[in-house]
């Protein structure tokens, strides 16, 4: 049996953007595997998560927060509605706008997915205490805002 040669030590420190990109892909892969048993994809899980925190968003508002086109978000919403996870209803103040909220089943599925994702995040951050986790989160959120991709008013 041949052994695989060890990888050479890095001669330079990797760029933070590269490491964050690798982490993003790894997290997406893990979340995809965790939510699939519930019939969700990462975009569906993301949409449900945002709707939990901001019920009543329109398709266009939700698309902006999920970084997808309104057309792509509409496809996600059609699937979520067919699965009974969301409710779409006309906005009270605008006849053409449709507001989206979670159904009771949507809240239950999201809670189950959140438990699985929290477990994964806890494993990923096992070497950090609460203060270290807060410091990491604050630094990452700051980076997001400085690049103009914030989560809304800070």
Write out the residue ranges for each language-model feature.
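Short helix-capping/turn signature of helix-turn-helix
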Residues: 51-54, 68, 143
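The alpha-helix within a helix-turn-helix
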Residues: 63
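N-terminal leader segment of winged-helix/HTH proteins
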Residues: 1-38, 131, 154
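Charged, amphipathic alpha-helical coiled-coil/dimerization segments
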Residues: 28, 56, 60, 78-145
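Short alpha-helical "packing" element that flanks the helix-turn-helix/winged-helix DNA-binding module
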Residues: 47-48
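Central "turn" residue of the DNA-binding helix-turn-helix
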Residues: 39, 55-56, 67, 129
């Amino acid at each position: 049996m041949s052994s695989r040669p060890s990888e050479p030590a890095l001669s330079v420190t990797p760029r933070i953007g590269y490491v964050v990109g690798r982490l993003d892909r790894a997290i997406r892969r893990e979340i995809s595997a965790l939510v699939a048993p519930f019939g969700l994809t990462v975009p569906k899980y993301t949409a449900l998560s945002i709707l939990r925190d901001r019920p009543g968003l329109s398709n266009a508002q939700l698309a902006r927060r999920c970084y997808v086109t309104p057309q792509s978000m509409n496809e996600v919403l059609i699937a979520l509605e067919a699965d009974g996870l969301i409710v779409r209803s006309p906005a009270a103040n605008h006849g053409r706008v449709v507001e989206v909220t979670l159904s009771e089943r949507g809240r239950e599925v999201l809670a189950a997915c959140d438990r699985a994702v929290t477990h994964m995040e806890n494993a990923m951050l096992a070497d950090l205490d609460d203060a270290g986790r807060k410091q990491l989160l604050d630094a990452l959120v700051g980076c997001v805002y400085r690049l103009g991709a914030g989560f809304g008013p800070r």
